[in-house]
UniProtKB/Swiss-Prot annotation:
Organism, as annotated: Bacillus licheniformis (strain ATCC 14580 / DSM 13 / JCM 2505 / CCUG 7422 / NBRC 12200 / NCIMB 9375 / NCTC 10341 / NRRL NRS-1264 / Gibson 46)
Pfam families reported for this sequence: FGGY_C (PF02782), FGGY_N (PF00370)
UniProt keyword terms in alphabetical order: Arabinose catabolism, ATP-binding, Carbohydrate metabolism, Kinase, Nucleotide-binding, Transferase
Family: Belongs to the ribulokinase family.
EC number per UniProt: 2.7.1.16
NCBIfam families listed in its UniProt record: L-ribulokinase (TIGR01234), PRK04123.1 (NF003154)
A Gene Ontology term for the protein's cellular component: cytoplasm
Reactions listed under catalytic activity: D-ribulose + ATP = D-ribulose 5-phosphate + ADP + H(+); L-ribulose + ATP = L-ribulose 5-phosphate + ADP + H(+)
GO molecular function: ATP binding; D-ribulokinase activity; ribulokinase activity
Name of the gene: araB
CDD domains the record matches: ASKHA_NBD_FGGY_L-RBK (cd07781)
Pathway involvement of the protein, from the record: Carbohydrate degradation; L-arabinose degradation via L-ribulose; D-xylulose 5-phosphate from L-arabinose (bacterial route): step 2/3
Name of the molecule in the record: Ribulokinase
């Protein structure tokens, strides 16, 4: 994993310079970096020092590449994965960076794909249903284990000393903004989509939180805050300390933080309802503007002003997309394929796409359920697992690859149909991210499966471009930026000339396969819990095995 920065001309949207910094610690999912303490299954942590390194290396790199005068830099925008949270002390220092807590896993950043709080999410949803909590429907009927409250419940239950020591539990996005400008201003995007906050009613009641765990009764006042700021606002000015580390001028405007998926919407020029954006990478987020709030089963959330001021913003998603393909390549692609790709001077992804693209639709006889990392929408269940149906002794890697690609496209089609059936129009489809940028084969499959033309982001770094747009908003017109999002998007948002159009004969064939996919989706997602029973047994046996190894 990495952090990325772009320097953008606010008048034209031209990306003048780009810099990338790989995270030193990457994703911590096996053992802690210093103590080497082993982590259980479904954990995904990060080290916050990596985030500061990104700022200290990428921003000076942008200035060096562009030869820009720091006086010309009018604003900074920050976006982040979410829900990605960390406990901090009263000085804003992450607890994992204090020696006494460095060996405690719960003191680290919990990445969005930390799924070890599924038990807590299940309990939260059960209690909320029993109490008829109104917020459930605005999250598609379920709160995901990826969101803030289940993760905080896990901390309170498994590491109460960490919960007690935390002066605040913050989204990483808000923490970075705090590091930049010294003000703790939480954004309405992560609060609304990930922390059960509403701009009219605030958070759920103290009584509800107490029913989850006694320690959580006063969580809003003790660990969170009701002081929430809208995306598009200015959080503050760059501190002298961070100015020294980045090479920028103290006082440079810093925007209220945002989420990587949501901030990409203006980057592709979307400023009105009816246009869905897919941000496609390891996972996929589906973003959509609306005129009013509609209850959509299995959506991740709907938040007023959550994406752009003046509109409600809808979010849905798939927990695993590109990670499927990475898994296949890591474990099941033969050496002969790797040598063939090397000989042709292309990546293994390109080779698999070429081979898969030469297959006829349905030729492999395979059908998959794209749940290798659970299901975010519309089933909202991290305990679901993947499935591949139809394999024979003749099945080849490219056939499995194509089946996985098609399954992710079917998952997106289910999301689109669910929104439409709930009264939320989707008339245009856009895509951004690494897959949209690099893989024509996958994008054509999506166009055929959804029967929609797909427009592609004009920037390979759509989240960073979107953040730059909000940085220009934070600066304001008096400082060379913009006062209104529509004006900023008109100058800075962009899409490519190339689009992917559905091929009629492919659409017809995929309709047949999609009907079969829906049968599997309903049966294994709602009717038969065999996946959960198998996962439970796996976890029990894994724990037993790990204990035996430790004793040995």
């Amino acid at each position: 994993m990495s952090g990325r920065a772009v320097l953008v001309d606010v008048r034209t949207g031209e990306e003048i310079a780009t810099a990338v910094k790989e995270y030193t610690h990457g994703v911590i999912d096996r053992e802690l970096p210093v103590s080497k303490r082993k982590l259980p299954r479904d954990w995904a942590l990060q080290h916050p020092a990596d985030y500061i390194e990104v700022l200290e290396e990428t921003i000076p790199s942008l200035l060096k590449q562009s030869k820009a005068d720091p006086k010309e830099i009018i604003g900074i925008g920050i976006d982040f994965t979410a829900c990605t949270i960390l406990p901090v002390d009263e000085n804003g220092t992450p607890l994992c960076m204090r020696e006494e807590y460095a060996s405690e896993p719960h003191s680290y950043v919990k990445l969005w794909k930390h799924h070890a709080a599924q038990e807590q999410a299940n309990r939260l949803n059960q209690i909320a249903e029993e109490r008829n909590e109104p917020f459930l429907q605005t999250y598609g009927g379920k709160i995901s284990s990826e969101w803030l409250v289940p993760k905080v419940m896990q901390i309170a239950e498994e590491a109460p000393d960490i919960y007690d020591a935390a002066a605040e539990i913050m989204e990483a996005a808000d923490w970075i903004v705090y590091m930049l400008c010294g003000t703790r201003k939480r954004n309405n995007c992560t609060a609304g989509y990930k922390a059960i906050w509403n701009n009219k009613s605030g958070y759920p009641s103290d009584d509800f939180f107490a029913s989850l765990h006694p320690k959580l009764k006063n969580i809003v006042r003790e660990k969170l805050t009701e002081d929430i700021y809208s995306v598009g606002e200015k959080a503050g000015g760059l501190t002298e300390e961070m100015a020294g580390k980045t090479g920028l001028l103290a006082g440079t405007a810093v925007a209220v933080a945002n989420v990587d998926a949501h901030v990409s919407v203006p980057a592709v020029g979307i400023t009105e309802p009816g246009k869905m954006l897919m941000i496609m990478g390891t996972s996929t987020c589906h973003m959509l503007l609306g005129e009013d709030v509609r209850m959509v089963p299995g959506m991740c959330g709907v938040v007023e002003d959550g994406i752009l001021p003046g509109y409600v913003g809808y979010e849905a998603g798939q927990s695993c997309v590109g990670d499927h393909f990475h898994w296949l390549i890591q474990h099941f692609v033969p050496e002969a394929y790797l040598k063939e790709a090397e000989a042709e001077g292309i990546s293994i992804y390109e080779l698999l796409s070429q081979k898969a693209g030469s297959l006829q639709i349905g030729e492999s006889g395979l059908l998959a359920l794209d749940w290798w990392n659970g299901n975010r929408s519309t089933l909202v269940d991290a305990d679901l697992t993947g499935m591949l149906l139809g394999m024979t002794l003749a099945t080849k890697p490219e056939e499995i690859y194509r089946a996985l690609v098609e399954a992710t496209a079917y998952g997106t089609r289910i999301i689109i149909e669910t929104f439409r059936q709930s009264g939320v129009p989707i008339e245009e489809l856009y895509a951004a991210g690494g897959i949209a940028e690099k893989n024509p084969f996958i994008m054509q499959v999506y166009a055929d499966v959804t029967n929609m033309e797909i427009k592609i982001s004009g920037s390979p770094q759509a989240p960073a471009l979107g953040s730059a747009i909000f940085g220009a908003l934070a600066a304001g017109s008096m400082n060379g930026g913009y006062d209104h999002i529509e004006e900023a998007v008109a100058h800075m948002g962009k899409i490519k000339d190339k689009t992917y159009k559905p091929i009629p004969e492919n659409v017809s064939l995929y309709d047949q396969l999609y009907a079969e996919y829906k049968e599997l989706y309903t049966y294994f997602g709602k009717q038969n819990n065999v996946m959960k029973r198998l996962k439970k047994l796996k976890n029990i046996q894994s724990l037993s095995s790990d204990t035996g190894k430790a004793m040995a």
